[in-house]
Amino acid sequence: MHLIFGGYAQGRLSYALKTYHKNRADVFDCATQPLSEWNGQTILYHLEALVSQSLQQNKAPLTLLQETVPNWQDCILITQEVGCGLVPISAEDRKWREAVGRMNAQLAAQAETVERIFCGLSMQLRKCPFQSRPPDAAANTGRQNKNPAEHPIEYY
C-alpha cells in the first residue's frame, strides 16, 4: 500500500498518475462514488471523503478503515493533508478534521511508502524497499569508502 497526501491543489493525483504509470481508468474517486462501487481500481483518490460519508451515517471512520484496508494492500491511496491550516469554527468540521488526521496517521503506519506532495513535488517520508538502491550500487558509483574531507566538492 502506498500513501500519498498533500494539501488542496498540490498535484497529488497528477504525481501518482505520472510516477506509477497509471491513467484515469485506474482511479476510483471516493468523493464522487460510494465505496461499494469500488471495482479494484489501483488508485483511491479523495480518501478523506470516506470520513465525511462515515460521519454522515453515524459510523466510526476508523472502523470502516479497519474493514477496508486489507483490500487495499496493492493500492495507491491519495488523501488530503489536514492540520496545517486554521482550526474550523464548527464542531462538525473539527470532528471531520480530527478523524481525517487519525485516518491518515493509521494509513501512514501501515503503508510501504508514504509521500507528501507539495507544489507537485514529492517528499518521501517512508521509502519502499524496492525503490531503494541495491546493496552493490555503491560499488558502481566509485564513492564507497571515500572520506568527505578528502573529496569535499562531491558532497555539496
Predicted regions and their residues:
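Glycine-rich P-loop/Walker A and Walker A-like loops and their local beta1-loop-alpha1 context
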Residues: 1-32
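Generic hydrophobic/packing signal
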Residues: 5, 20, 45-48, 86
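Short, solvent-exposed loop/turn segments at secondary-structure junctions
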Residues: 10, 49-50, 83, 122
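A short secondary-structure junction signal
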Residues: 15, 55-56, 128
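Short, intrinsically disordered, mixed-charge
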Residues: 21-22, 56, 105
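Conserved nucleotide-sensing/catalytic segment adjacent to the nucleotide-binding pocket
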Residues: 25-27, 35-77
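A short acidic, often aromatic-flanked loop/helix-cap motif at beta-alpha or helix-coil junctions
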Residues: 33-37, 122-124
